[in-house]
Amino acid sequence: MKTQSLISMGLLPILSVNAAYTWPSKYDELEDILYLQAGYRRYGFRDGVTPCGFSADGSNRETAAEWIKTAYHDMATHDVETGLGGLDASIAYELGRAENPGSAFNGTFGFTNNYASIKSSNSDLLAMSVVVASMACGGPIIPFRAGRIDAVQAGVPGVPQPDQDLATHTAIFAKQGFNTTEMITMVACGHVLGGVHGVDFPQITGDNNETSFPHFNSQYDNFTNSIVTEYLEDKSIDVLVVGKNDTFNSDKRIFGADNNKTMTSLADPSNFQAQCRDIFARMIDTVPASVTLSEVITPIEVKPTELSLALGANNTLSFTGSIRVRTTHRNADNVTVSLRYRDRNNNLSNTTISTERGRWQLGQSYGFAREVFTFYEFDTAFDVTSSISSFDVIIHTAGEADEINTNNGLGFPVSDAILLQAPQSCQPQIIVNEAGQWNLTITAAVRADRVGEPVAFDWVYKRFIQGVMINQLEVQRTVMEKASEEIGGYYLYTATKPIDTVQWSTTFDLVLGEGDNVSKLEFLSTGNLASTCQPFP
């Protein structure tokens, strides 16, 4: 089968395509954030660490190093005996502790907050920041899993400090689940990038100036093993190795904990990359025992995006969207895409929906490891009496047999029970009450045979916590009321909710029914709504 032959062409093992993927997945948003780094549709997560030595806060900072540091400090409170702690974003509540000095942590959350949502937790984004920082700096490709759950309060203290002795450090790492070899590897890999901030550790650098930033090694902005080779050759510039006050030379004590056996093995560049990949994967996958992580998130071959089915004029349903095709191993110039679809009663249509490749930036997005994705867009209409229930994606490559993607035999589902009427929904930026709030109006079309069932939209409220950079997300339900007579087999429902202006850009779900008979449209954006609601045609 053609799909199998394409999979066999894969990149590195952890970037191989997951044939078991079924759309939609609750991790679709995270997959997009990780793989759509540039181009036609981009999330740009790598922007914060490109080039590797970059920091928006100036030359005495290195964001890539800070992302890795934040993830480690967050994970460091894990206890293998109790199963408590781990990578859970609890560090956002722990910044008043002496073990977490400096602005690196809030700086990290200041960036990842831009991507946090009900589908992408802060802790998953912290894990992803390690993956992206490593790749942006020429380091190993670290497998990324999802499913972390954000803490809502501080965890126990336990981050190792530079003035602690080797026995204490060994015990702390053992509590986290790492043996002596792994402790050495973690510190060596974690100190490839960046250095020590004098403003946070003047007792180490001897200079409390903001610009004091002695680096761990001479290649601090490139993921190499110079931290190892310089140490073994007695050429180290690491102030945690050659500092004037030996009490704070924690790297020296840790690196030599097994008489340099581990450091000597890490002098081989290939082994260094492999060991850093594995130890960073262990680090970001160290989570509370109550959390179950997903399989490794790999690039998806065929993925619908931004699908919209809406009630239109003259008893029609407008159907728009795009199909994202992984063209890393395909020549997109030779590819065309069409959809074969099934009507509301699951009857296969004898016509197909054509698509057109996106024009801007050739319709292509790019990711790490030379990943390429090409978008094919469509805009069509159905009669309301026939509608659509699912579709398959047909990929035609010139000179080859067609490849039909059936979403593992299920078809790509499209529900026509409840529809977002985007033109009739809006968010006027006009203050409507003494609290300084705006109105958010959501309008949906509900199929006539489902009228009488409860209709609502579930809106994600961002709760701001003083002194904490991340928000706690709460789902609030707003009941919608019928607002029209029957229109082509549908009724319009609407609701208006006053919201604080800082909540203007969030997400919501449309919900029809209850119990076992619920239809949903999920992860819709308020930020995409116009400022004026239009009347229905």
Where are these regions (language model features)?
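Fungal secretory targeting signals
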Residues: 1-22
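Catalytic cores of secreted/periplasmic or lumenal enzymes
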Residues: 18-537
